[in-house]
Regions:
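Short, charged, amphipathic alpha-helical segments
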Residues: 45-49, 92, 121-126
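Acidic interhelical loop/turn segments
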Residues: 4, 40-41, 74-84, 106-129, ...
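Acidic/His metal-coordination segments adjacent to aromatic residues that form catalytic metal sites
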Residues: 4-14, 76-97
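A structural feature that tracks compact, well-ordered secondary-structure segments
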Residues: 14-18, 23-30, 102-106
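Conserved small/polar residues in nucleotide/adenosyl-binding loops
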Residues: 160-166
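Conserved alpha-helical segments that form or flank metal/cofactor-binding pockets of metalloenzymes
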Residues: 25-28, 32, 36-76, 137-144
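Amphipathic, heptad-repeat alpha-helices with coiled-coil/zipper character that mediate oligomerization
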Residues: 61, 96-104
């Protein structure tokens, strides 16, 4: 394999690692979306679904770049979905996951730079910025739950109820 092919393979490997992480996030967040909705936390469920959709976009962006480089996008999921989480545990867990993702993506961005692929490095920078927004949201909700507890969660249930038929 030539140096160029080796560098490209390194970048594709980095992209597939990130794609696998995004696939896990999609499954985890959609599972949480369904559970939050079932527990009548509609506003939290709706926001979780929007974040999962962001992760779907990221996953597709990584896949498109992998294909542009001549690689095969992975369909492997990085981890197992944690099911049946208590509402109070979801947001601190997701915050930790997003923090880990940001750290790993920064490392993968460096792999791209070290292998001369600035375009893919910029893709990672863009996605890292969006992951930071998710982290901030999860931290904010986690802090509200920790500080206000059931009062906060009750308010969410009351604010987001289905309209009654008239």
């Amino acid at each position: 394999m030539s140096d160029r092919e080796t560098r490209k393979a390194n970048v594709i490997e980095a992209l597939n690692k990130a794609r696998s992480m995004e696939l896990h996030a999609i499954h985890q967040y959609m599972n949480q979306h369904y559970n939050l909705d079932d527990m009548d936390y509609g506003e939290l469920a709706a926001n979780m679904k929007l974040i999962a959709i962001d992760e779907m976009r990221h996953c597709e962006m990584f896949a498109e770049r992998i294909k542009e480089l001549g690689g095969e996008p992975t369909s492997e999921v990085a981890g197992k979905v944690v099911k049946g989480q208590e509402v109070k545990a979801i947001y601190s867990s997701d915050s930790d996951s997003e923090d880990d993702t940001i750290f790993v993506y920064n490392e993968l961005r460096k792999v791209c730079v070290d292998n001369g692929d600035i375009l893919t490095a910029k893709l990672f920078e863009t996605i890292i910025g969006e992951e930071q927004i998710h982290l901030n949201y999860f931290d904010n909700i986690s802090d509200h739950i920790e500080t206000l507890g059931d009062t906060f969660l009750s308010k969410i249930c009351l604010l987001y109820t289905s309209p009654s038929p008239r």
